[in-house]
Amino acid sequence: MVSLLLARIISISSVFLCLARVNSTPLNATVFDGLDQQARDILARATPAAPHWVIYSDQFVSGTTGPPAVSAVTGFNVFALSFLLTEGAFDKAFEWTTLTAAQRASVKAQYNAAGIKLVVSVFGSTDVPTSSGVNPVTMATTMANWVIEFNLDGIDVDYEDFNAFDAGDGKAEAWLISFTTQLRTLLPQGTYILTHAPVAPWFSPTIWGGGGYLKVHAAVGNLIDWYNVQVISSELRKRPYHFSAEGATEYTTCANLLTTSSNTWPQTALFQIASSGVPLSKLVIGKPATTGAASNGFMSTSTLASCLAQAKSQGWNAGAMVWEYPGATAAWIQAVRASSFPV
């Protein structure tokens, strides 16, 4: 997913804009009654059960610093501030740091009351940590400490170092395994959310010399809560030499999305990935909100809703992800969930 990387001066100037009003309902006092603050914080961060309804936000929105009002994203249960890069926080992740501790606590409490977790997404299409020689353990330590410092519910690993994966020498997979292991050491399972956002083609069992995401899953899948699978051939935006009539329309029908991918990216439809050993409950279906959000893979909300209903009828319940707010809002997720998990 593409980071806008707004100039820091624009991000800094947004601090002076009014903090968006966040609507909320009172916390259920009985849930936290008798618990100390540490226990309350852990319960508030606890990993939610499927289905997961995830929305990313990287785009500058005038008048809003950090997350929007809860009413704007009702129906989602995870909001990903994007992106934390190897160089530091940018865009929505940076905006979060500019709020005072009291403001962050207020927003966090209101999102928690609405059942929405706040996480940070890291890397995106801008960072190429393996190709750049970044130490995975050191970087994981830095990023995990950032999550803790800024009181978020977890971290999403949107790794898009395509050159490293294409090399087929296993370095990308080894980097991800080390990075994930260290993240989970510092962000314990059940207390913090840890997700990955791979593109669907990386789950192919026949293409990647280093083993691809199936190797990553075999090594550390037990540490990853779920995968926000970018079933949008997003790498095609970056690697035009992979464009073909077949690839450009990949994952745009329910059959292609759920049961049988094309020969361009073999065995990467939802149920095919599950057949390769990844639990269905961990495979969240990711799509762009608009035709402008990605060069391919777009589905209308009605078509996507139909696909989700079909998947649910076959035992799937993982949920859906969208790139990004404000292209998608409460209305988008209400339409997408209408036939399967209505809001």
Language-model segments: residues:
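Glycan-recognition surfaces
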Residues: K287-A289, V322-Y325
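Structured C-terminal cap/extension of enzyme domains
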Residues: Q310, Q314, G319-A320
